[in-house]
Amino acid sequence: MPYEVKNKDKFKFVEEGEGESLVLLHGLFGALSNFETLIEYFRQHYKVIVPILPLFELDILHSTVGGIAKFVHRFLEARDLKNVHLLGNSLGGHVALVHVLKHPERIKSLTLTGSSGLFENGMGDSYPKRGDYEYIKNKTELTFYDPKTATKELVDEVYGIINNRIKAIKIISLAKSAIRNNLGEELNQIKQPTLLIWEIMTTLPRLL
């Protein structure tokens, strides 16, 4: 179902339900469409908040995992969110890790689904073929447990992003940042209760 995207204090976000705050951080593609099922379920128990991350709005120097993490911190401060249950998917999981390491005082629990931040598999078995729609469709379908999740609308979105020169450059910047920003040596500093969700096998970089 479509959700109202609010625009306050220069932040765009979805907010549904009541209760303790559950903040969802999306990956590179899909944003709200990837979280519809989660929003619908958790809004019955939590105040579910999904900030729209400025993945393609930041300048190239700040198109990094750290740059997105700073945005998330500003968002939580602006909304005065405390004791947050933070859930991050893929690149959003990496951003969540960086945030909780720098600002643990605001986070009550951490959930990571297919998070980047430990090991990156490059671009899989080949480089992205920007003009090949079928290639992009197949790679997008591989991102999900159920390939049907990759609707034509989502594939069209990914195809459009990949074929936009400026956005493609920022994707590369984010991907390189994720590879450089390995957090393996810092994970023992996280004291919040943490749930890890990971597929048995993956052939994709954990950014989507």
Label for each model-derived stretch:
Residues 1-10:
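N-terminal cap/lid segment of alpha/beta-hydrolase-fold proteins
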Residues 9-58:
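Conserved HGGG/HGGXW glycine-rich cap/lid loop of the alpha/beta-hydrolase fold
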Residues 14, 40, 49-87:
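Active-site loop/oxyanion-hole signature of alpha/beta-hydrolase fold enzymes
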Residues 21, 47, 82-85, 106-109, ...:
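Structural signature of beta-strand start/N-cap positions in the alpha/beta core
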Residues 26-28, 84, 88-93:
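Conserved alpha/beta-hydrolase "nucleophile elbow" surrounding the catalytic nucleophile
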Residues 38-42, 189-208:
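Conserved loop-alpha-helix segment in the C-terminal half of the alpha/beta-hydrolase fold
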Residues 94-138:
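Flexible "cap/lid" loop of the alpha/beta hydrolase fold
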Residues 130-192:
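Conserved alpha/beta-hydrolase catalytic His-Asp/Glu region
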